[in-house]
């Protein structure tokens, strides 16, 4: 295995050795380099033996370093091989429920422990072996994000449709004993792993604290594309409230015993149950934002905090913004408050129902351009449309349905502004000049 160099940092020790972009690093101290985790770990030393494939063959160096830290090689990919694909057939898998016509990359299911550390992906551990656990502990790759779902081995085999689903639960205590911090995700399926099974899971995971540093529960997503899949019944207000009660009960007990809650229901449970989102203190360090835990609380608090700061506004501004059905009431309330404090700013909120996936999906991050066009075309009141960044891929240029921001702007006949995910930054974006402004000048208006 090898990792190919994409760029050499100027003035670095790698440059001093004569390494070039395109060279391939093979090993450090005879340790094969499979990915950038290996590279970072083995080159963070005062001396090492480096082997690389260069333009004229294989070269080796005995490296003596003046100081530890980055060696100076950058890579276009973090992995020397392919991503580890998922070997499960989970009863709740959202990717299996995707409609056709979306971005091609969305149909790939990864289950790679390296991506867990590098990018926060959640893994089930079913394609991991003992030597990979040993490597994580040796290199102290921490934290690791694990999709647990249940600690009942037989039930986990059933839920993941993988015979190793229960067996690999033994890796959890090994990781914890090895000093690896773990964030846990529980995707709950109504009548399957909630109720008493949820109590069992939370009780088992609490035995692994404090190295299990957070546990989040999210409801199984249900789209209209579940043909030939396990029948899932969406959670309603009553069953969502029951999940909240169990999670909060165990969270309260954990806080009494360990001084920290660590157990959090995602925002969606509270919205489904018709209960208010808890205050910021409930979420402590906001360890599970990517699972939608405390995201609405943080957004609201940051937005209001920014509104409380003084802002000098010139002229008038008008903008339309879109959001999903879950966040719709909160975003509408915040925009009304913005207009109340700054009457010269008028924000029209368009709550977009997710017909693309089906009526049970309400998060803003899964809204597509297709639904925005279908529901908002001809209804905009300004020349600017604000799109939350969570609706787009990381490069902020393409929706889930493979429609680009430029294509949406052309179809709608407006300028499209990508709004930040942070509540404070979104408030700043709406308050700053340059969205759609009319300024009064002496002798007339423009």
Predicted regions and their residues:
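Structural preference for beta-strand elements that scaffold enzyme active sites
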Residues: 143-145, 181-183, 214-216, 262-264, ...
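PDZ/PDZ-like groove recognition
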Residues: 1-9
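Radical SAM enzyme core and accessory elements
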Residues: 4, 274-446
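Flexible, glycine/charged-enriched surface loops at secondary-structure junctions
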Residues: 22, 212, 254-264, 345, ...
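Conserved PDZ fold ligand-binding element
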Residues: 14-34
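Conserved Radical SAM active-site core
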Residues: 58, 65-211, 221-250
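Flexible glycine/acidic-rich beta-alpha junction loops that bind and position SAM and/or redox cofactors
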Residues: 192, 212-238, 258-281, 354-360, ...
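PDZ domains, with a preference for the canonical peptide-binding region formed by the helix
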Residues: 27-51
């Amino acid at each position: 295995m090898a990792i190919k160099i994409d760029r050499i940092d100027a003035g670095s020790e790698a440059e001093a050795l004569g390494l070039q972009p395109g060279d391939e690093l093979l090993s450090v101290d005879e340790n094969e380099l499979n990915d950038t985790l290996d590279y970072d770990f083995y080159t963070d030393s005062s001396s090492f033996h480096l082997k690389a494939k260069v333009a004229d063959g294989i070269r080796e160096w005995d490296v003596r370093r003046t100081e530890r830290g980055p060696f100076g090689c950058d890579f276009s990919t973090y992995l020397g091989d392919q991503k580890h694909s998922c070997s499960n057939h989970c009863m709740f898998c959202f990717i299996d429920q995707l409609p056709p016509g979306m971005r091609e990359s969305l149909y790939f299911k990864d289950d790679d422990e390296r991506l867990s550390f590098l990018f926060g992906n959640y893994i089930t551990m079913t394609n991991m072996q003992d030597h990979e656990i040993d490597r994580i502990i040796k290199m102290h790759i921490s934290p690791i994000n694990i999709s647990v779902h249940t600690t009942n081995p037989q039930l986990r085999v059933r839920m993941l449709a993988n015979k190793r689903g229960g067996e690999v639960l033994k890796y959890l205590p090994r990781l914890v004993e090895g000093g690896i911090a773990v964030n846990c995700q529980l995707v709950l399926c109504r009548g399957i792993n909630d109720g008493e099974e949820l109590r069992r899971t939370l009780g088992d995971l609490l035995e692994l604290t404090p190295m299990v540093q957070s546990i989040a529960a999210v409801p199984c997503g249900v789209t209209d594309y579940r043909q030939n899949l396990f029948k899932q019944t969406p959670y309603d207000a009553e069953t969502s409230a029951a999940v909240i009660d169990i999670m909060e009960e165990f969270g309260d007990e954990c806080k009494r015993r360990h001084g920290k809650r660590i157990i959090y229901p995602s925002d969606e449970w509270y919205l489904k149950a018709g209960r208010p989102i808890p205050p910021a203190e409930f979420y402590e360090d906001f360890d599970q934002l990517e699972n939608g835990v405390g995201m609405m609380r943080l957004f609201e608090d940051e937005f209001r905090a920014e509104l409380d700061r003084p802002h000098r506004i010139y002229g008038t501004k008008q903008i339309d913004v879109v959001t999903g059905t879950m966040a719709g009431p909160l975003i509408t309330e915040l925009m009304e408050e913005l207009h109340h404090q700054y009457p010269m700013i008028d924000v029209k909120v368009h709550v977009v129902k997710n017909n693309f996936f089906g009526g049970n999906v309400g998060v803003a991050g899964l809204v597509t351009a297709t639904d925005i066009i279908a529901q908002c075309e001809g209804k905009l009141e300004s020349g600017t449309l604000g799109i939350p960044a969570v609706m787009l891929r990381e490069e902020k240029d393409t929706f889930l349905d493979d429609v680009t921001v430029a294509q949406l702007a052309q179809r709608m006949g407006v300028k499209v502004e990508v709004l930040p995910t942070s509540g404070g930054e979104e408030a700043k974006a709406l308050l700053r000049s340059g969205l759609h402004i009319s300024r009064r000048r002496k002798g007339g208006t423009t």
